[in-house]
Amino acid sequence: MHTQSAYKNLSALQAYSLRLYDGLEAEIGQKVGSHIVGGFFLAQTKKRMEEFKYLAGKFRSIGLEYDLVSPSEIKSKFPLLNVSDLEGGAWDPEEGYVDPYSVTMGLATAAKKNGAKIIENTQIDTISRLPSGHWELTSGDHIFECEIIVNCAGFWAREVAEMINTSVPITNMEHHYLVTENIPTVEALHNELPIIRDTDSHFYLRQENNGLLFGSWEKDCRAAWNGKSAPWSFGQELFNNDLARLEENLAMIFHRLPELHSTGIKQITNGAISFSPDGRPIVGPMPGVPGFFVACGFVGGIAQAGGVGLAMSQWILNGEPELNLDFMDVARFGDWTTKEFARERTYEIFPKRYEIIYPAMERQSGRFLKLTPINNDLIKLGAIMGQSNGWERPLWYAPDGVEARDELSFQRPNWWEHVGNEAKGMALGCGLTEMSTYGKFLITGSDALEFLNYVGSAKAPERSGKIALSLLLNERGGIVGDVIIDCRNGNEFYLVGATLGVLFYQRWLEAHTGGFNVKIKNATSHYAAIGISGPNSRALLNSLSNNCFDEFPYMTSKDLEINGIACRALRVSYSGELGWELHCPISNQKALFDALMNCGKNYGLVLIGSRAMGMLRLEKGYRSWGAEITTEVTPHAAGLQRFCSSKKNYIGRKKIDSEKKTPPKKRLVTLDVDLLAPPCWGDEPIFSNGELIGYVTSGGMGWRCNKMLAVGWIDASKIGIGDMLEVQILLQFYNAKVISDPIYDPENQLLLN
């Protein structure tokens, strides 16, 4: 049980769990078997130590200790270890373990003390919706009615979800751990040994009485119950041991602990463990099913239980948790996460539980599920594809003679300069971007305009052909998302938002339709979109449209034809250059793409991947959903208050008004980082005169201005434009200057041309 996680907010939840369990004994008067002994993460390679450096900075940014240590320091606290092949490690002083049974009973006792009622040995047979909107659950002859259901059914989470015709992508896996006989060396110790995670050998280890308990993430992994549903009658039964599958893993464990060669094994346990397709918990309100929440998929269940319980209670009582949890929200999964996908992806990640998590890392299993019509064309042109919300989309393009694959790194990866060439090529001529994966919604009905004015911060456009950028805010003023609103007519609007935010946006919009005559249709799969931007974009598009792009102001839209193909053109540009988005029925995308590519040769057209777009937006100070745009950030803090109307009422308006009078202490700023520094990937700590004041949310190269850029979330009460700060990257300090946005084309002359 530990606080560290690849996601800082999950680390915060796990830290809460530790504090909760520490205080549980005092509240209920019984011990919960808490042992805070500290723990080492071992590194056998320089690459692993580089990851530890990255993680140390991340954890420092949120106030957690994570110190790099030498092999001799590890040996001094755990003398049984063979450290001869170690590069070093990391030390977590809050690492520990608890007795799961005692914690469970302790939490139940505390819950009952505070009014909870727990009904045991009651299997639910059916779940149905009542006319009142409440739920009816049956168990034999018993009937229960409730407003809220939380599916925390563990091994049976998928089956419970299927009772309401939805799905949770859980795969149950077999997992072994072993317990040794007493070891004289351990018995002779005066202090309990720290916990060990040998990340490169993929095993964990801790003291169990006077012996050791260890387990590994089996390379030859197996689905529990042969991939079938967990039996409803399953209790605490175990599976047959299959040590043949652990042979390679055990060899690595015995190498690390030579004393095991002469130690007996007194217990072998092969039990079930639930995995989500990305190894993270699945929590939150089920999209499209009001009053139904999910809390399952916990690999580190005990470590996460307390914090997730807090977040779920906030979600249910207040409508949202205090922390942004989109990385573990059930809305990150769509209908593409089938049972087959979940199993295939789990088989990939299970043996790699402790793998190095590199920036911009892509999975290889469960791919090519959702394809646009030009997918194969892009691959033939050198596209290295990534997966986003189930869709395949181009990350970058390998030129002729360059191998089309990612080489992962915390430094500048192999694609760095190629992404730069895409950005610079677009700025000199024009660029084509595949944008079909963006979320797209049709909002219709007699109250559509009124609805959009209520849920969005900006005044919704009233006339056809007008566009607005609007923020979706919660009552605390936190940003749920940002959308482009294109007015097609008075009662029909077309919304475009972030690829990863599709189900988040849809769930949020649907939750606020009460009292409005409005329909919301997720049209993401029905429409394709291609972006054309750069100084030659107008000339290219005019050549294919009888000069339809001459009189075409910024933030407007038109229905027109490109080489005879009907499109809706939106004058918006995420690159900050002159540009348009061309939206058409997805069946017409191939013809549109071919026309643009054939004619584009005359205008310097280059292909642009999502990684180049992610860097281009930094130069314009544009914010990204999931990085800068989160429910923890308000428009004033993000520098987006210009998109908040002062002439209408909308969700979050009170918070917006209050921040006009009292600006938030924390805000987002753009930093000009030392040009020789490694990239900022996110979560690097930021210092002012040696004092920690914030962390990086995202970063990259500003190719048009030749600057290394980062966006920082800082305590800005004493920080202004031009001030010098320091960013700690891989435990090295680099100078960073606070600059004003945008650094590229600050007067927007190119954008508004």
Task: Map each language-model feature to its residues.
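Dinucleotide-binding Rossmann-like beta1-alpha1 core, especially the glycine-rich loop
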Residues: H2-K77, D200-L205, G211-L213, Y347-P359, ...
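Central beta-strand plus flanking loop segment that forms part of the substrate or channel wall
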Residues: M1-S5, G39-F41, N165-N191, E248, ...
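Flavin-dependent oxidoreductases
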Residues: I127-N240, E248-E259, F341-E362, G366-L371, ...
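Short Gly/Pro-enriched turn/cap motifs at secondary-structure boundaries
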Residues: V168-I170, L193-R197, F203-Y204, G264, ...
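Flavin (FAD/FMN) cofactor-binding and adjacent substrate-gating region
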Residues: L20-G23, H35, Q44-E120, D125-G133, ...
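C-terminal catalytic lobe of FAD-dependent flavoproteins
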Residues: P100, D200, N209, A223, ...
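General small-molecule cofactor/ligand-binding pocket signal
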Residues: D67-V69, K117-I119, T263-K266, K519-A523, ...
